[in-house]
A protein has these predicted regions:
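A conserved regulatory-domain signal marking ACT and ACT-like small-molecule sensing domains
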Residues: 2-90
Length: 90
């Protein structure tokens, strides 16, 4: 049974939707959230919720997003590399 969330890619392969929650922690600096959400935008991931706390210049950030199974691995790979560059942990 197909639902409104089911998508078919250009090759005609059905893509399953995935909800992913990532938790980011580390030193808070300008641009961390922007850099990570820019990656989500590159893959047309839909950000569903963001929660953030900054305690004594330490960032705790949670991002819930929806994507498809065909690109979720690539998104996570790119997020992990960017997190390494930004010196934060996912």
């Amino acid at each position: 049974m197909e639902t409104a969330n089911d998508k078919t890619n250009v090759q005609g392969i059905k893509e399953d939707p995935e909800l992913i929650l990532i938790n980011i922690s580390g030193a808070d600096r300008p641009g961390v959230t922007a850099a990570l959400t820019a990656i989500l935008a590159q893959y047309d991931a839909m950000v569903l919720d963001i929660g953030q706390a900054d305690i004594h210049h330490t960032l705790s950030l949670g991002i819930l997003f929806r994507t498809t199974s065909s690109v979720s691995g690539e998104i996570m790979k790119d997020l992990l590399f960017k997190a390494y560059d930004l010196q934060v942990k996912i």
